[in-house]
């Protein structure tokens, strides 16, 4: 009911077209850490940036994103090792209890990233965590965005 009231306030004359409606709905969307990780695994860097900006604006604590990314990248590393051991991808996904909906995302990530690339992302994530705790000097938000964009398969400038 609140969404209808918001639309009435935004469009007092009562006329709204499909594009305006979709734009309004998009602005009202609440993004989650899981959504940004799925967007990265899917390879959608534009959506990753959009969700990231929304999470920062909503003051989502970086530690939540760090822990979720750590868990996801760690699982990808283990699956990558199993893939190198010539196990079938379907078998690996089933053994790790990957939901049917996420299987294409995980499969895509395993095709795009090597074991070494995933390991490097995990090491960078560790530095980000240390920076958050004051033991390193990285810009936490810039580095988190960088990891997510890299996870989405986009090549970034080398520092």
Specify the residue positions occupied by each region the protein language model found:
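Small-residue-rich helix-loop
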Residues: 11-118, 156
């Amino acid at each position: 009911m609140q969404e209808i009231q918001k639309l009435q306030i935004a469009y007092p004359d009562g006329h709204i077209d499909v594009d305006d409606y979709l734009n309004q709905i998009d602005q009202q969307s609440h993004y989650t850490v899981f959504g940004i990780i799925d967007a990265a695994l899917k390879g959608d860097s534009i959506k990753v940036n959009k969700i990231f900006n929304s999470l920062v604006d909503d003051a989502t604590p970086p530690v939540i994103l760090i822990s979720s990314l750590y868990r996801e990248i760690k699982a990808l590393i283990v699956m990558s090792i199993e893939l190198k051991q010539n196990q079938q991808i379907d078998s690996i996904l089933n053994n790790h209890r990957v939901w049917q909906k996420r299987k294409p995302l995980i499969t895509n990530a395993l095709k795009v990233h090597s074991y070494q690339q995933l390991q490097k992302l995990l090491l960078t994530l560790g530095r980000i965590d240390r920076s958050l705790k004051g033991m390193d000097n990285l810009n936490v938000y810039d580095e988190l965005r960088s990891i997510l964009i890299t996870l989405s398969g986009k090549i970034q400038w080398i520092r």
